[in-house]
């Protein structure tokens, strides 16, 4: 008999789709991905991964997002 394990997210697991939405919100409509990536010091491809929820931003990037937006890291990660 095959044993099935149910995978649950721990409270510390980031919700990448929500983080992605908030990063897009921080970038806004005034900046292209390329422009915003340059401000953050990353490639446009990496910013795209963050904005699509395919990658979790590093602490360094979270700090840069905080500095750029004036939003807390808690807000970027949780929306609160």
Locate each region found by the language model:
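DNA major-groove recognition helix of helix-turn-helix/homeodomain DNA-binding modules
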Residues: 60-75
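Conserved hydrophobic/aromatic packing and binding residues within compact polymer-binding modules
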Residues: 23, 36-37, 47-50, 76
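Recognition helix of helix-turn-helix/homeodomain-like DNA-binding domains
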Residues: 41-57
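Short basic helix-loop element that most often maps to the first helix and adjoining turn
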Residues: 20-39, 64
């Amino acid at each position: 008999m095959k044993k099935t394990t149910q995978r649950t997210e721990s409270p510390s697991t980031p919700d990448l789709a929500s983080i992605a939405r908030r990063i897009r919100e921080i970038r806004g409509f005034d900046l292209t991905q390329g422009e915003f990536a340059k401000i953050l010091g990353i490639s446009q491809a990496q910013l795209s991964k963050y904005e699509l929820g395919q990658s979790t931003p590093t602490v360094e990037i979270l700090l840069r997002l905080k500095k750029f937006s004036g939003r807390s890291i808690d807000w970027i990660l949780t929306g609160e």
